[in-house]
């Protein structure tokens, strides 16, 4: 069970518990089609389109997350299960909590597919949503127009498996930015945030995030998190300019030799 933490995002409880709570939020609001378990390892299995819903999330104590098998046997079982499903064996590894597991997998040939930062922020009362040029639309489901922006049709089933708000920014009746935000208790998580490259640098990303945070606030959230590829310098700069703070890093590690 994940214990509730203090109100200010990213502070208060022991760091390991804060990491676990945020990763639980990510897991809960982006639910996989199927879950198998090896002790306290959650094997998330879907259609392969998104790494989060198709990867192992350790949830137990460090250093390895408490699989109920010897670490070598547990990893072999992960490989077997994912390959039987036609999926690439993948781990989501929050750091530094599971740094030893991350290093172990690296030593036996698992490569880093993506490294990302988990950012957090508090949702304030004064969210400026005024715009003379752009229209904000918030809905409770992903419309066809929303899905078409990033060709997210394959994600629709996963997204509909948890209640969320879907934001759009429109210019001259054309959708130029989208995002999703889902709330659990006082915490919310923003995902699938995207701005049409032709409209970047105009404050649209910040406007979209404020609109999403306002929607989450209406659902009871006081805090927001999001995950950003560590190589997305522009995105990291935008969010940090809005007051988002770095909380922790995580790697997606994949089995390099999938014929193993």
Predicted features, each with a name:
Residues 83-94, 216-227:
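Conserved GNAT acetyl-CoA-binding A-motif
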Residues 71-79, 192-197, 201-218, 237-241:
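Conserved acetyl-CoA-binding loop-helix of GNAT-fold acetyltransferases
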Residues 1-84, 97-98, 102, 158-160:
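N-terminal charged segments
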Residues 57-67, 193-200, 229:
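A short, internal acetyl-CoA/4′-phosphopantetheine-binding micro-motif in the GNAT/acyltransferase core
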Residues 2-5, 33-42, 122-140:
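Conserved N-terminal entry element of GNAT/NAT acetyltransferase domains
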Residues 92-99, 226-236, 253-259:
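Conserved beta-strand-loop-alpha-helix junction that forms the acyl-donor binding cleft
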Residues 1, 34-38, 100-108, 163-179:
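Conserved beta-hairpin
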Residues 156-197:
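A conserved beta-strand-loop-helix scaffold within acyl/acetyltransferase catalytic domains
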